[in-house]
Amino acid sequence: MKEKALSIVILAAGKGTRMYSDLPKVLHKIAGKPMVKHVIDTVKSIHAKNIHLVYGHGGEVMQTRLQDEPVNWVLQAEQLGTGHAMQQAAPFFADDENILMLYGDGPLITAETLQTLIAAKPEHGIALLTVVLDDPTGYGRIVRENGNVVAIVEQKDANAEQLKIQEINTGLLVADGKSLKKWLSQLTNNNAQGEYYITDVIALANQDGCQVVAVQASDFMEVEGVNNRQQLARLERYYQRKQADNLLLAGVALADPERFDLRGELSHGKDVEIDVNVIIEGKVSLGHRVKIGAGCVLKNCQIGDDVEIKPYSVLEEAIVGQAAQIGPFSRLRPGTALADNTHIGNFVEIKKAHIGTGSKVNHLSYVGDAEVGMQCNIGAGVITCNYDGANKFKTIIGDNVFVGSDVQLVAPVTIETGATIGAGTTVTKDVACDELVISRVPQRHIQGWQRPTKQTKK
């Protein structure tokens, strides 16, 4: 039998009142990415035909933040329950496809669990995702007869026997489009809250003689939703520890897996060592034997073999060659490219600059919009003056150039191979090969000088 097409509905219209935030709840982040984006990425990996995103509160913000996502935006103008949300999406359902309902505030659901749920769906019935809890207090209980689900009973409506049930409803379900549209049209809001509940389709399916089965998730955290910042923080730490464990199993040496954050994708070689409180963002690749010191932040970087990044350095969109030494307290900004065996020291900032093989910028310097050749020494306090208040200009430094301390290189300027710039010089004109350039205020010696003294108050 031909496999049915799959469409996804992600419910994301809630206000998230308990977050105490102007930001829509589903846009709050786990591992640097909005919760709903985690869900979207997961369903994209299972090749859904359509992704319907039901939105309401903060719709303009959501559409702006998620403008590149391949979703069909479905407005739920009034939040009248989960069933009502699904009713808004129902006109887009095809009769001959499966419809999988998810929640935008459940970011940790995995593709494997969803595929298991879809595979379990009866031909014209419903498959629910459930989980067994030691303490199910507060959750809707799954009531079964002969293995099939006949009802979901909320805590307040459960009798003594039903309260003993430990299997609870996660809210995730899959059904075929034709049947689901029928059941959604039959929902009523005849309840204390005056809302339309998706759970009522279970009774409607049973009335039609359709089978309702339940698939149990192995890990409650996978289906945990977020209603407040405490829950958000709990999911963040769980997810980070899970990522850290995966890296440990892959051979990365983490000094403390509880104090490591991965907010993107990390690829790595062998014998990588990462100290505490390191943050990885975006796409980062680490070569073999890379060492990262405590408190470093790397975002969208490529790091070569045998590089050492010393504590509290910040690297963003940088490419670092083999055996480079960086830090402590260095900053590499976007557009930085360090060749092999370069040294970037403490309180040095590099921006949109190429530093050649073996060159050193070791202390208290700013190098921006520049090309630095091989085997150069850039002394302490050197500044490339690249901005005139309106435009940026480039500094070009050839090979084997020595730049002394406290030098200002006023761009645009070129310093050719082998030149030497004396300490305290302000360079405003090009320097030829092997020249020595010095520009200083003449030194004066004043004999008998006395320091001023403080005047006493009368």
From Swiss-Prot:
Its EC number is 2.7.7.23, 2.3.1.157. GO terms for molecular function: glucosamine-1-phosphate N-acetyltransferase activity; magnesium ion binding; UDP-N-acetylglucosamine diphosphorylase activity. It is found in: Cytoplasm. The active site is at H363. Keywords: Acyltransferase, Cell shape, Cell wall biogenesis/degradation, Cytoplasm, Magnesium, Metal-binding, Multifunctional enzyme, Nucleotidyltransferase, Peptidoglycan synthesis, Repeat, Transferase. UDP-N-acetyl-alpha-D-glucosamine binds at residues 11-14, 25, 76, 81-82, 103-105, 140, 154, 169, 227, 333, 351, 366, 377. Its cofactor is Mg(2+). Acetyl-CoA binds at A380, N386, Y387, S405, A423, R440. Pathway: Nucleotide-sugar biosynthesis; UDP-N-acetyl-alpha-D-glucosamine biosynthesis; N-acetyl-alpha-D-glucosamine 1-phosphate from alpha-D-glucosamine 6-phosphate (route II): step 2/2; Nucleotide-sugar biosynthesis; UDP-N-acetyl-alpha-D-glucosamine biosynthesis; UDP-N-acetyl-alpha-D-glucosamine from N-acetyl-alpha-D-glucosamine 1-phosphate: step 1/1; Bacterial outer membrane biogenesis; LPS lipid A biosynthesis. Residues 1-229 are annotated as: Pyrophosphorylase. Binds 1 Mg(2+) ion per subunit. Residues 230-250 are annotated as: Linker. Coiled coil: none annotated. It catalyses: alpha-D-glucosamine 1-phosphate + acetyl-CoA = N-acetyl-alpha-D-glucosamine 1-phosphate + CoA + H(+); N-acetyl-alpha-D-glucosamine 1-phosphate + UTP + H(+) = UDP-N-acetyl-alpha-D-glucosamine + diphosphate. Residues 251-458 are annotated as: N-acetyltransferase. Its main location: cytoplasm. It comes from the Bacteria. GO terms for cellular component: cytoplasm; membrane. In the N-terminal section; belongs to the N-acetylglucosamine-1-phosphate uridyltransferase family. In the C-terminal section; belongs to the transferase hexapeptide repeat family. Catalyzes the last two sequential reactions in the de novo biosynthetic pathway for UDP-N-acetylglucosamine (UDP-GlcNAc). The C-terminal domain catalyzes the transfer of acetyl group from acetyl coenzyme A to glucosamine-1-phosphate (GlcN-1-P) to produce N-acetylglucosamine-1-phosphate (GlcNAc-1-P), which is converted into UDP-GlcNAc by the transfer of uridine 5-monophosphate (from uridine 5-triphosphate), a reaction catalyzed by the N-terminal domain. Homotrimer. This is Bifunctional protein GlmU. It comes from Pasteurella multocida (strain Pm70).
